[in-house]
Each structure stands twice: as structure tokens, then as C-alpha cells.
Amino acid sequence: MSDTWLNKVNWSADGLVPVVTQDAISNKVLMVAWMNPEALRLTAQTGEAHYWSRSRKKLWHKGEESGHVQKVKEIRLDCDEDVLLLVVEQVGGVACHTGRHHCFFKKLEQDQWLVTEPVIKNPEEIYGQR
């Protein structure tokens, strides 16, 4: 596969694009992350999500430590060509490093952020003590 399709993406000045990751079954948004061209290429080639970690400044294969990989069903590019959507099968049901199904587990109620989603698996069981 030629890489010309990568040039259609409007990468930011720092060479990144935001990625919304959605569960293929529930349609819930699981997480938002970032990709550089190499992460997108690897995702397309392997069928599993790869992202760019801005804090660690390195490629990150989702599930490399936890086993909770994301099997990619679709890769979509938005109308402005500057945001990606990954539709995935979330292996193990846990997408968030907090041990929850998705990262959007805090909901604004009145003037407080309330935790609305349970922990599915204790992060220490997933990653060990850090």
C-alpha cells in the first residue's frame, strides 16, 4: 500500500492529529488520543490501534502492557481532514488506564464532576504497581 493516503490528513504543525476512538458495538466514545503518520500507518497495516504519546514522546500500541488491544474495524477522516475516528472492538472491555470501559466517566452535575462509571478491573491488576 502506498503512503499517499497519509498526505490527505491535515496534520497539525507538530505532526499530530486527534483521534476519537469509538466502540463498534455500543457506539460509545472510548477515548481521545493522538496519532502521528507512523502511528496511523501501523494502525492501518496491523489492524490494531497505535497512538502517539505526547507525554512519553513515543509510539504506543494500545494494549501493549494491559492486553486490552483495540481491533480496528474502520478508520474514518472527518470533513476537514484534521480529526480521525477509529471504530474498534475493545478487547477485554477496558479502554481507560483507570480500569474503566471508557475515559469519559466523569459527568458534570450542578457544579461537581461525578464519577458515573464503575472500575471494571483494578489498574494495579492490569499494570502492576507503578
Curated annotation (Swiss-Prot):
GO-annotated molecular function: magnesium ion binding; phosphoribosyl-AMP cyclohydrolase activity; zinc ion binding
EC class of the enzyme, as a word: hydrolase
One GO biological process term: L-histidine biosynthetic process
The record's free-text note on cofactor binding: Binds 1 Mg(2+) ion per subunit. Binds 1 zinc ion per subunit.
One cellular-component annotation, GO: cytoplasm
Binding, Zn(2+): C79, C96, C103
Binding-site residues for Mg(2+), renumbered to this chain: D78, D80, D82
Keywords: Amino-acid biosynthesis, Cytoplasm, Histidine biosynthesis, Hydrolase, Magnesium, Metal-binding, Zinc
Enzyme Commission no: 3.5.4.19
Cofactors: Mg(2+); Zn(2+)
Family from the record: Belongs to the PRA-CH family.
Function: Catalyzes the hydrolysis of the adenine ring of phosphoribosyl-AMP.
PANTHER family named among the record's database cross-references: HISTIDINE BIOSYNTHESIS BIFUNCTIONAL PROTEIN, HISTIDINE BIOSYNTHESIS BIFUNCTIONAL PROTEIN HIS7
Stored HAMAP family: HisI
Subunit structure: Homodimer.
Name listed for the protein in its UniProt record: Phosphoribosyl-AMP cyclohydrolase
Higher taxonomy: Bacteria, Pseudomonadati, Pseudomonadota, Betaproteobacteria, Nitrosomonadales
Gene name, Swiss-Prot/TrEMBL: hisI
